[in-house]
């Protein structure tokens, strides 16, 4: 079973959020430490937030690969996307506009891949 991890992109602040968890109803909350009252839990408006799923894979440097990451394998660059229809991750070749499905990712030397950015910070 893959680990259930995610990261949150805040579209308004144009940054990834830390210390966020998702409630059982899908509501986003943020932990704030070192407040006057200790630890605080704050509701986050999810309208301008994007939840990016963890693929369960790591690049050659041990970094976790998430939806939205841009990876390089040999001399080709790919964008990782979530395919909701098949509940899997796809890999789109940015230079050739070819799309590969989940099983292809597992067989495509992903262990030799390197994360070179993401679609939010490296447009």
Predicted regions and their residues:
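Secondary-structure transition motif
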Residues: 1-123
């Amino acid at each position: 079973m893959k680990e259930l991890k995610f990261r949150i992109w805040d579209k308004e602040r144009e940054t990834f959020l830390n210390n966020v968890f998702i409630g059982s109803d899908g509501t986003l909350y943020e932990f704030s430490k070192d407040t006057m009252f200790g630890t605080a839990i704050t509701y986050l408006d999810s309208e301008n937030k994007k939840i990016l799923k963890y693929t369960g894979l790591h690049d050659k440097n041990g970094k976790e690969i998430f939806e939205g990451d841009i990876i390089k394998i040999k001399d080709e660059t790919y964008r990782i996307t979530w395919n909701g229809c098949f509940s899997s991750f796809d890999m789109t070749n940015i230079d050739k506009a070819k799309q590969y499905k989940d099983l292809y990712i597992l067989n495509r030397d992903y262990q030799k891949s390197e994360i070179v950015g993401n679609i939010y910070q490296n447009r």
